[in-house]
Amino acid sequence: MIHKTIEPARAQRAEAAAFIQEHFETAPEYLLILGTGLGQLAEEMTIDTVLPYDEIPHFPVSTVESHAGKLLLGRLGGKPVMAMQGRFHYYEGYSMQQIVFPVRVAKALGVQTLLVSNACGGLNPNFERGDIMLINDHINFLGDNPLMGPN
């Protein structure tokens, strides 16, 4: 039995994916969330389509002034990519399910690889600014988690 709250989320995801799919010829292999440190990567892309978040059904809209709020469809290094200019934060009032909605839409479109950048602190004194990290776990004191409930 499917949990009663998951069906509307799946329908919204399918609607958003269908809308985005109308705007590209080749399914994207990668989703790039252009956060801190990756914003200029958009300048390296061959951009075919720019979709403002507020035009994509059910997509959250970033309230952070420095976030452009656009989904870019194109190529980078010859690979088909989707790139998000701006992401969503818990402190903006979004639920975890809303925050991860674009990632789930990307998966529905066939994306297999997600690249995210962010600014963070670290406890290990051997870490230096600009180090690349692979996150395989985290400490969450928020009391909410994007993996809670049906996935």
What kind of feature is each model-predicted range?
Residues 2-151:
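Metabolite-binding pocket within alpha/beta catalytic cores that recognizes anionic/polar moieties
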